[in-house]
Amino acid sequence: MMFVMLCHFGSGHTGIRLETLALIRDMLNAGISPVVPSHGSVGYLTLEGHIGMVMIGEGRATHQGETLDGAEALKRAGLKPVVLSSKEGLILLSGTTSVTAFASLAIYDAQTLSLTADIAGSFMLEVLKGTLMAMDERLMAVRPHPDQINTAANIRAILKDSPMLERYRGHRVQDALSIRCMPQLYGPVKKAVKDAQATLAIELNSSVDNPLIFDEEDGGAVALMGCNAAKKAYDSMHLAKYILAAELICDGQALDCYDDKRCAKGTQAIYDLLRSKVPEMDNDMPLTPYLEAVTQQIIDRAYIRTVEASVGALKF
């Protein structure tokens, strides 16, 4: 949120002074994080207010792992509270700062999950003795949605040298709809994420205060419930990580059911990374710690890095 404040307030149309803007920058660089409740306001203005409180030496903030009074946090970082001038209190409460901040985090997570879904889906296709026929470049070319094409290309790249797919070639005429239509499902998701990212990039580089300062008076539209929608998207991305974690754990366990576990180079890398946190399960055991561990790997983009190190860059 503080980074978004710098983007929004630094446009030159808000009337904020440079020293006030500089304090936000210095707080970020010093690792001062205001304690901001995520609920409790009609709309979203309370969130920004808690940041402003620390800037004037009130409220609470964390610094070097310790939660302190706002004034003490500033003091330990060698900073001084600001005395707000004309319009600056309003600036710190107005605009779409929290909306844009939550949406930015949601978009980043969505990008991570989109590529991780390609990875988990490839692993699933292999352990279910699937076929790459539905991912054929010729099929993609006659319905040339770019993101659908990219998804199919990712799956082909991960599974291109799979001994398991070769052993079970012709095992069935075609895979289940949920498997063979991964490009048609995951591709539009990529497009939706890209469209949202383009809109967000404009918003991030906008001036969103009300009123704005021009040579001639002007106004702007107000987005109602924007923060609720952005936070809901962010929370949804968090829950989706657990779904992909469960899929990866099931994929790994399915591979362990085979006597011959030889698989594609890409999926072997996925399996090895998975097994670094999750053991082979030969009896009942609590799964929560393993779900948390794999979810953290997903958050850290570990599966994306591992697969790209094995088969090359994935397409988004």
Language-model region placement:
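Transmembrane helical cores of multi-pass ion-transport proteins
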Residues: F3-L6, I24-N29
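Cysteine-centered functional microenvironments
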Residues: S38-G40
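A glycine-rich phosphate/pyrophosphate-binding beta-strand-loop-alpha-helix module
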Residues: M1-T14
